[in-house]
Swiss-Prot record:
Keywords assigned: Ribonucleoprotein, Ribosomal protein, RNA-binding, rRNA-binding
Record protein name field: Large ribosomal subunit protein uL2
Lineage: Bacteria, Pseudomonadati, Thermodesulfobacteriota, Desulfuromonadia, Geobacterales
PANTHER family: LARGE RIBOSOMAL SUBUNIT PROTEIN UL2M, RIBOSOMAL PROTEIN L2
Job description of the protein: One of the primary rRNA binding proteins. Required for association of the 30S and 50S subunits to form the 70S ribosome, for tRNA binding and peptide bond formation. It has been suggested to have peptidyltransferase activity; this is somewhat controversial. Makes several contacts with the 16S rRNA in the 70S ribosome.
Organism: Trichlorobacter lovleyi (strain ATCC BAA-1151 / DSM 17278 / SZ) (Geobacter lovleyi)
Keyword rRNA-binding set for record: yes
UniProt subunit comment: Part of the 50S ribosomal subunit. Forms a bridge to the 30S subunit in the 70S ribosome.
GO biological process, one term: cytoplasmic translation
Residue ranges of the region described as Disordered: 223-256
Coiled coil location: none
Length: 274
């Protein structure tokens, strides 16, 4: 994948960059793996906003992705590499030898015509899914399960990867993209390689409208609001807010720790570094 830029024919074009999509081999998704999505605009069933700055955006259909990789021992051929509007990574359509079709996240260097396999006996090559106990130490992995059979939850966005650090007893130590080192059960499955579309982080949207296409609404500053809307609101003329930064609900922000302790914290060997 590469990034293309544009001639500055307008202010919005000046810094805009876009993917060349050269790795995409099909623009038509597999119909049997599509599901309708109803937009919520960030509202819950009461109609109240529970997730701010969401709404609008281009109409999309959800692609059913196989995060469980539970079709063990049956080889599959990569038919297409496709764009997915619901995630930053590209997806690959697999045709299994028994006739079934599934989507998976497309790892780096996976190409049309390649064969992938899921199971303890699979080779160590991009796209193959194995339990952590069958993966050599130091291997780059992604799409990692936290609970056996639940499906992958870690290292799924474009360009991300984790690394298998060590094995001890029934747990493996995995270094996550954040720098956190975590214990994961050795029977949990992970996929070999790094998630593709690694240049995604270098894309510059260039204009507000492109964010709106993605369903992102403007984030209004608290100091620009009225006192009824935000603790920083009001005042004559421009103000600094007059207090340490807080959320719209009065909770300190910008560095204030709000994360509560969980029982799963005992599986964190080393806290994240970024």
């Amino acid at each position: 994948m590469a990034i293309k830029s544009y001639k500055p024919t307008s202010a919005g074009r000046r810094h805009q960059t876009c993917s060349t999509f050269e790795e995409i081999t099909s623009t038509t998704p597999e119909k049997s793996l599509l599901v309708k999505i109803k937009k919520t605009g960030g509202r819950n069933h009461f109609g109240r906003v529970t997730a701010r700055h969401q709404g609008g955006g281009h109409k999309q259909k959800y692609r059913m992705i196989d995060f469980r990789r539970d079709k063990r021992g049956i080889p599959a051929k990569v038919a297409t590499i496709e764009y997915d509007p619901n995630r930053s990574a590209r997806i690959a359509l697999l045709h299994y030898t028994d006739g079934e079709k599934r989507y998976i996240l497309a790892p780096l260097d996976l190409k049309v015509g390649d064969t992938v396999l899921s199971g303890p006996e699979a080779d160590i090559k991009p796209g193959n899914s194995l339990p952590l106990r069958s993966i050599p130490l130091g291997t780059i992995i992604h799409n990692i399960e936290l609970k056996i059979g639940k499906g992958a939850q870690l290292a799924r966005s474009a360009g991300t990867f984790a690394q298998l650090m060590s094995k001890e007893g029934k747990y493996s130590q995995v270094k996550l993209p954040s720098g956190e080192v975590r214990l994961v059960l050795q029977d949990c499955y992970a996929t070999i390689g790094q998630v593709g579309n690694i240049d995604h982080e270098n894309v510059c949207l260039g204009k507000a409208g492109r964010s709106r296409w993605l369903g992102k609404r403007p984030k209004v500053r608290g100091v620009a609001m009225n006192p009824v809307d935000h603790p920083h609101g009001g005042g004559e003329g421009r103000t600094s807010g007059g207090r340490h930064p807080v959320t719209p609900w009065g909770i300190p922000t910008k560095g204030y720790k709000t994360r509560t302790n969980k029982t799963s914290d005992r599986f964190i060997v080393k806290k994240r570094t970024k």
